[in-house]
């Protein structure tokens, strides 16, 4: 029994490390998962295309979680292939988890019967099992699974709201990498007052301002430079450090984002122009 699914990356509106409340938005950069479920075998194996040495514990745990809930003790194999760079702050783990959960549900023939929010929670549980997240990252998972902007309380895995937003986006990813599980949570908690302000801005629909305040606050908390955000500000509706870095994401209209992209190309690393994504994760 085989299943396939894709899930988008995401950018940050509000980093949840300060208060447990976070918000993110889906980006049109995909991760694809292919899952084979075999009744005659036990155990789960995994591979990540192009990264033979990468840790596959997360996606393997996603398959196991789904089979434990909806299967009958089958074994399985998962292969993911991604446009999303690993450890870059673009929610590669959430995208991989969502795609794997949906692909496994598809392989079991129950993808249409499972609520998408519940499916995202399965991936979050697997991420906690695998130790790849501090907060559970339900905000990232919800944005990737549902599309658009999602705000969540990660302490309860509670979806506070989801909204549809359409932006052009520029993504700058420096050469270095940063792992979410290594983030200095204590320093992030020191900007909790600003995080609460960001949450209020986002709840009022002022996502661009929310992003920008979040970006400046968490650049300070996580020791990333603010210069890339300041460079983008005159041309963007909002700009933020994405997740725990090192990527930055700017959003706005097409002309403004082209200007941001041009300026960010002066830096080492890679720059990508894309758009927000409203459809979320889906089987294929």
Swiss-Prot record:
Cellular localization per UniProt: Cytoplasm
Enzyme nomenclature, EC number: 2.7.1.71
Catalytic activity: shikimate + ATP = 3-phosphoshikimate + ADP + H(+)
UniProtKB keywords: Amino-acid biosynthesis, Aromatic amino acid biosynthesis, ATP-binding, Cytoplasm, Kinase, Nucleotide-binding, Transferase
Endpoints of the signal sequence: none
Enzyme class label: transferase
Gene Ontology MF term list: ATP binding; shikimate kinase activity
Gene3D superfamilies with a match to the protein in the record: 3.30.230.10
Pathway(s) the chain acts in: Metabolic intermediate biosynthesis; chorismate biosynthesis; chorismate from D-erythrose 4-phosphate and phosphoenolpyruvate: step 5/7
Major subcellular site: cytoplasm
Entries under InterPro entries matching the protein: GHMP_kinase_N_dom, Ribosomal_Su5_D2-typ_SF, Ribsml_uS5_D2-typ_fold_subgr, SK_arc
Biological process terms in GO annotation: amino acid biosynthetic process; aromatic amino acid family biosynthetic process; chorismate biosynthetic process
UniProt-annotated binding residues for ATP: 85-95
Single GO cellular component term: cytoplasm
Similarity comment: family membership: Belongs to the GHMP kinase family. Archaeal shikimate kinase subfamily.
HAMAP family per record: Shik_kinase_arch
PANTHER family in alphabetical order: HOMOSERINE/4-DIPHOSPHOCYTIDYL-2-C-METHYL-D-ERYTHRITOL KINASE, SHIKIMATE KINASE
NCBIfam families in the cross-refs: Shik_kin_archae (TIGR01920)
Protein name in UniProt: Shikimate kinase
Organism of provenance: Halobacterium salinarum (strain ATCC 700922 / JCM 11081 / NRC-1) (Halobacterium halobium)
